[in-house]
Amino acid sequence: SFFEQNXKIVYVARNAKD
């Protein structure tokens, strides 16, 4: 679903940023 994908993207983005 969109929310599941979005959450995953956010998780990866935060990890990459950190």
UniProtKB/Swiss-Prot annotation:
Q: Which GO terms describe its molecular function?
A: aryl sulfotransferase activity
Q: Which GO terms describe its cellular component?
A: cytoplasm
| Catalytic function, reaction form | a phenol + 3'-phosphoadenylyl sulfate = an aryl sulfate + adenosine 3',5'-bisphosphate + H(+)
EC number(s) per UniProt?
A: 2.8.2.1
What is the uppermost EC class here? transferase
The alphabetized list of GO BP terms reads:
steroid metabolic process
Q: Where in the cell is it found?
A: Cytoplasm
Where does the UniProt entry say this protein principally localizes? cytoplasm
Family of this protein: Belongs to the sulfotransferase 1 family.
Q: What does this protein do?
A: Sulfotransferase that utilizes 3'-phospho-5'-adenylyl sulfate (PAPS) as sulfonate donor to catalyze the sulfate conjugation of phenolic compounds.
Protein's name in the database: Phenol sulfotransferase
The root-end lineage is:
Eukaryota, Metazoa, Chordata, Craniata, Vertebrata
